[in-house]
Swiss-Prot record:
Location (main, coarse): mitochondrion
Protein name (Swiss-Prot/TrEMBL): Mitochondrial genome maintenance protein MGM101
Primary gene name: MGM101
Matching Pfam families: Mgm101p
GO MF annotation terms: DNA binding; single-stranded DNA binding
UniProt keyword Cell inner membrane, yes or no: no
Job description of the protein: Performs an essential function in the repair of oxidatively damaged mtDNA that is required for the maintenance of the mitochondrial genome. Binds to DNA.
Organism: Yarrowia lipolytica (strain CLIB 122 / E 150) (Yeast)
Length: 289
């Protein structure tokens, strides 16, 4: 049985469509197989972290600027009147307590504060400017007692150094006087000497040079302290302390009444020597009668 014309035409059209579709797919496949596949580009590390940081900063800014919505149903806060606010006493805020000076002592405090700027090595601040009070003068010029006076084996009368300090403390009070060096310490082969100034109540009252002998180099520090004590004794002469010890008549009278000169024998070399001592006392070592 022969096919009909319509059937033949339909078969031809169908075959033509298959050829057209195959021809269309072949160039695409050929281009895909001819060109190698290129991998997708990854973002650079710097751009990646830049984007991450940008996103984080954007999120933080958005969170910071985000406002919590207020419920529409909550009532609005009423303004507080100034009269209704609690009153706070601010009169004592940031105020340091004021120190009250004792009566008559404020001027002395500021006087001592100003002394920090005075160079006592060269200054003569207050020298002879004003007399001391009557009470201080009576203490300074009080007569000596017989029990306070000592005598050296060579026959020199003296007052122990601690007695001078007690007189100054009684007249001006502890801390009301002091000794200021006015020169460098000079050390010779046998003597240490230095000049000192006596300052009482913030003013210079006397200047004297002290001296002390020594026998070896190890005794220089002790001699320096003795030099200071000797200068204090000489400065106190201007204040009238133990002024009797500088009077020849008093010295002769005291030695005649309370002292005696005896022969002393050295306990080591047995040499004899005339020495002075107080009556009723014995000779000091290394001598004996």
């Amino acid at each position: 049985m022969r096919p009909t014309v319509a059937l033949v035409v339909a078969r031809g059209v169908r075959a033509m469509g298959y050829r057209t579709a195959a021809a269309a797919t072949k160039p695409a496949a050929a281009s895909a197989t001819s060109a190698p596949a290129t991998p997708a580009k990854k973002p650079a590390a710097s751009s990646y972290w830049r984007k991450a940081a940008s996103a984080a900063s954007t999120a933080s800014v958005s969170n910071a600027t985000k406002k919590t919505p207020v419920a529409a149903s909550s009532p609005a806060a009423e303004p507080i009147e100034a009269d209704d606010m609690p009153q706070v006493d601010t009169s004592t805020v940031d105020q340091a307590p004021t120190f009250q000076y004792p009566e008559g002592a404020q001027s002395n405090v500021f006087q001592h504060m100003n002394q920090r700027e005075i160079d006592w090595e060269q200054s003569f601040q207050g020298l002879g400017s004003q007399a001391f009070s009557k009470e201080a003068a009576q203490v300074l010029q009080a007569p000596l007692t017989v029990e306070d006076i000592e005598i050296t084996p060579d026959g020199l009368l003296y007052l122990p150094e601690i007695k001078y300090r007690r007189v100054l403390n009684a007249a001006f009070g502890p801390g009301g006087w002091g000794l200021a060096p006015r020169s460098d310490t000079v050390v010779t082969d046998k003597i240490v000497t230095r000049e000192y100034g006596l300052i009482c109540e913030g003013r210079l009252v006397s200047v004297a040079r002290g001296e002390q002998t020594y026998f070896n180099e190890d005794g220089v520090p002790t001699a320096s302290e003795g030099c200071k004590s000797n200068a204090m004794m000489r400065c106190c002469k201007d204040l009238g302390v133990a002024s009797e010890l500088w009077e020849p008549k008093f010295i002769r009278k005291f030695k005649a009444q309370h002292c005696e000169e005896v022969w002393g024998t050295h306990v080591v070399n047995k040499r004899k020597k005339k020495l002075w001592k107080l009556k009723g006392e014995t000779l000091a070592y290394p001598y004996q009668e």
